[in-house]
Structure formats: C-alpha cells, structure tokens
Amino acid sequence: YSRATMQQTAPGSTFKMITAFAGMNEGVIGVNDVIQTKGYFDKTETPAKCWIYPSAHGTIGISKAIEESCNYFFYELGYRMATKDTGTYSDITGVERLQKYAGMFGFDSTSGIELPESKPQISDADSIRTAIGQGTNNFTATQLARYVTTLANSGTCYDLSLVSEIKDIDGNVVYKNEHKVHNQLDFPAEQWNVVRQGMRQVVSVHTSSSALINQINVAVAGKTGT
C-alpha cells in the first residue's frame, strides 16, 4: 500500500491557487484587485470563519491572500463565482466553475504514475468551502505533486512517471519513455506572476523558515495547507 498514491485527503489551502486562477479567468477578480476581508463570512446560510478570526487580514490582493492563506478572501471568490450570472447565490454554479479549473490542473484523472492509484475526487458541494480546498475535495500526494508542477512550469500539466527507460538483459534499450502532456493551461503571464509571487512570499516573508530559505541560491515557493 503506497500512501503517496493511495491515501487521499482534502488538499486544504494548497487548493487556493486554483481558486485564484478560477476567479481571474471567470472575471470575478482582476490581477490587481483587492478585497476587504473580515474574519467572519456570512453571505450564505452556512457562515464560515477565517483561521485568523476574530481578527481579519484587512484589504488584500491575490498575492497577499495566498501568503497569508486568508480564508475569507477565497470564500469571497467562491461566492462571486456562484453569483456571477444572476446575482443570486447558486452553489452548484460556483462548484462547477471550481471543478473546471481543478480539472485543468490534472485533478480530473489519476496522475499517470505506474502504480495503483486512488481516483481523485473534486468537490461536488459547497462552493464557499470548496474554494479553500475543503468541501468534498479528496486527492493523493502524487496528484498534488502534478498540480504543483503545473504551477511551477507555467501551465504544462504532465503525466507523472517513474520509468525513464527499460533495458533487456544485454543492456539494450527496449523501451524509451517519452513525457506525456495531460493538459496545457494558457493563462496570461500576469496571472502566473501574481499567484507565484504569493507562493514565494509564503516561504520568504515573516516565516520561521524564511531565514534559512533566504540563504540558499535557489528561488523557493510553497503553500501551507491544513
């Protein structure tokens, strides 16, 4: 039993970059827009709290929201995607929009790795909580790895593989593995930049690891997730 390929869990806040891309491409937030966040989101029948409640993160944009992992900011994006068409909240509308973008990042199928793997489950309920990686989202570590790789390389979503080549007993190559592209995401450069800037800030600004990370000659980015 491989935990990396079989054990599933909610991605939590690691999902928030998908919500950011969904919000930008669905036209509910611009790259440079800000949201006045509060600690308590009460625009739906099932209110939700930010992790910082009873405090709040104030007025922030996408990069800062990713850095601070502000739940309220992403609740608001989930809400806007659910109300865009009619002005009335439609949970399924918001969920379907988030499902669309999660699928683009590879969560619509197993990762391609040559091992038994659990089938990913993209959330099918609760647009507000789906937007922060909860709802019924359920993925494996390998599926999350493919998603993060897609973020890192500006939109090429590859199938994962453990096999480079296969040789026979005499050392002859009988199979040469070629990379397989699952999907190509053609988002504007400014969108990639604002999301990845937030991920960079996660590990480089006011964190317990920033002092260490800032000493190495490699640009590191990341995202918290609980």
Predicted regions and their residues:
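Beta-lactam-recognizing serine transpeptidase/beta-lactamase-like catalytic domain environment
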Residues: 1-13, 18-226
